[in-house]
Regions:
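FAD-dependent oxidoreductase catalytic-site/capping-region signature
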Residues: 6, 10, 16-178
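Catalytic cores of eukaryotic secretory-pathway lumenal/extracellular enzymes that build
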Residues: 1-3
Length: 178
């Protein structure tokens, strides 16, 4: 989940982090039926190919107007930023779910096994590089002076990018395998 700081445009981070901001979000919804409570987490979706020779896209982005270190576990950042989450929609890695014992109350063992194939690791690196290129080089984003917060502009090597991807890999919105 890469994160980009932005200037000249407000994200939801600061509003969500304050009691007053949350109150205003709630009141806007109650009285106007507009605002952040009327929308899904992702405001934009995009598809692309990690390799131009592919017949169909293998990457999907969900772009959220907010950022945090760990989804659902930490507060939003105290700066304005957005999160362009990139997913491999044709993964070759396979996880599994196993029954642990006969007791139905015992949680199953889940091995997610993200990024366990060379192909998936290569696509993860390509996805992060393409995200960076779109945000840092396109005219659309230049007026917001984006700064790469994560993985960090100094991380360029494919293996380093894969390591960063594995640090934040998670399932989102069922892009594949549901």
């Amino acid at each position: 989940r890469p994160i980009y700081k932005i200037n000249g445009l407000k994200s939801l981070n600061k509003k969500i982090n304050s009691l007053f901001g949350n109150l205003m979000i709630g009141l806007e919804y109650i009285f106007k039926r507009t605002g952040p409570m009327t929308m899904g987490a992702s405001q934009l979706c995009m598809f692309a190919k990690s390799d131009p020779s592919l017949e169909l896209p293998d990457l999907q982005w969900h772009i959220q107007p907010m950022s945090m270190d760990t989804l659902g576990a930490t507060k939003n950042h105290d700066f304005h930023a957005f999160t362009p989450t990139v997913s491999n929609i044709k993964p070759t890695s396979r996880g599994h779910v196993s029954i642990v014992d006969k007791d139905s109350r015992t949680y199953a063992k889940i091995k997610q096994n993200y990024l366990s194939t060379d192909n998936d690791r290569m696509i993860a690196a390509k996805g992060l590089k393409l995200t960076r290129k779109i945000i840092m080089e396109s005219e659309t984003f230049k007026k917001y002076s984006p700064e790469e917060y994560r993985p960090g502009i100094n991380i360029n090597d494919d293996e380093e990018l894969v390591k960063e991807a594995s640090n934040y890999a998670q399932t989102i919105f069922h892009p594949v395998g549901t």
